[in-house]
Amino acid sequence: YTGWLLHGTKGGLAAGIFFVLPSVLILLLLSIIYVTFGDLPWVSALFQGLKPAVVAIVILAMIKIAKKSLVTNYHYIIALLSFIAIYFYNISFPLIILGTIVFALVHHKWINKSNNQSNQNSAINQDEKGYYLTTSSVIPHAGFQLKRLVSQIALFAILWVAPLLLFYSLSSNFSFWQQLSLFFTQAAFVTFGGAYAVLPYVAQQAVENFQWLSSAQMIDGLALGETTPGPLIMVLAFVGFMGGYQAFGSSLLAGSLGLLTTTYYTFLPCFLFIFAGAPIIEKTQHNTHIKHILSFVTAAVTGVILNLTLYFAEAVIFGKTAENLLSINWHEVQWLNVIWIVISVIALYRFKIDMLIWLAVSAIFGLTTYFIA
C-alpha cells in the first residue's frame, strides 16, 4: 500500500513482491529441511523446545490485540461470542465476520447513533511538517475510475485462472490443486486482522477437513514462520508445502509447487485489494461508519485468536487437540511444557527479551532436555 501511494502500480508491485520474496525462498528451504530431517530425534527435540515458546508468543499477540480492540462492553461481548462460535460450535471464520458486520451496522444505526456526534467532526491534530505524504497531499493516481477498476478485476480473473488451466492440463491430480487454490483464495478474502486472525480458520480446514498436516506440524510451521523474515502470513505457505508433499507421496517437488501455489493465491487477492480498493480507501479513510464496523471486526478477531491460542496450547500441553475444554483428559498434562510456556511469557512480556533470541533459547532448551533424557 505504501509503495502504491508513493509510486503507483509499479511501486505497489515492487514493494509487495520484494516484501514477500525473501521469506518465500527461506521458508521453502526450511520446509524441505523439515520434511527431510524432521524425524531425527535431535531435530524433533529442537521443535519440542520451540512449541511452548510459540504458544507464549500467540498468547502475547492476543493480549496486545485485545488491549487495543476491546474498548467498550459491546466489543467484549462480540469477542466472547466469536470465541464461543468458533471453539464450541465450529462456525467458520467468514460467517463470524459476516455476523459481526451485521451487528456493527445495527449497533451504529440504533444503539450508537447518539454517541459523540462531535467525533465525526473532529480530526486528529498532528504536526505533519517534514512528512513526504500528509493528509492534505494530492495523489494523482488515487482518484477512483470505474474503467480502471473493471480492467483490474478482469486482469485479476485472468491471473487467477491461468495457473489452474496449467494444472488441469499437466497434473494427474487436478482436484488437489483446485482445492488448494480455491481455499487459499478464500482465506485471503477473509484475512481481517492479519495472520493470527486467519490461522484458526486455516488450521481448522487444513488439519481437520483436508488433512494436509497434523496439528503438531501446524505448530512447527508457525515456529518456522516466527523465525523467518517477512510477514507471518507466510505460515500458510508451509501449509501448502505440506499439502503437496502429502498428496503426492512425499514428493519434494510437489511440496515446493504447493508452497509457491499457496503463496501466489494468498497474495494475488491482496494486490487486487490494493490496486482496486486503495482509491476507495483514500476517499473513505475518515468515514466513521467504516471505522465503527472495523472496530467490531477487530473485536471478533480477538475471540478467534483466543481460539487459536487454546488450539495450539492443547496440542503442546496435552500432546493432542480436543473438541473443547470439557473433553480434555487433565491427567495427560505435560508439565515441562506448561512451565516453559509460563517462563516464555514472563521473559517476553516482563523482561522484553527479543523474540528471536528467546526462540533460540527455547530451541537450546529442547535439545538440552533431549540429551539429559
Range-by-range predicted roles:
Residues 1-228, 235-373:
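Multi-pass membrane proteins that catalyze or facilitate reactions on polyprenyl-/lipid-phosphate substrates
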